[in-house]
Amino acid sequence: MYALLLMLILADGAALPGTWKGRISDLKCGAMVDTACNRRCIEEGQQAVLVEDETGEIRPINNTDFVKKYAGAHVEVQGSSKDGQINVRVVKPLDK
């Protein structure tokens, strides 16, 4: 029953809730996280991304303005994911 429900949700393209840990970067710099550069690029209009700790995957963040003050920081984000992009609802800075 749960498997069927999950298949229907995924087939519909619904956003799935989740929690991810990583560093906030920007689309131009990607996995090359540099706080000053990331801040500058995001201020200039680049989309924010999360570089995941475990996989190194670069996940675009839909609501860049919500996370821009954390550029270059190691964070845990909570939100939802759809089509590989994260819509962040909560940001928790992590120890360096």
Locate each region found by the language model:
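Conserved RNA-binding domains used in RNP assembly and mRNA/RNA metabolism
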Residues: 12-96
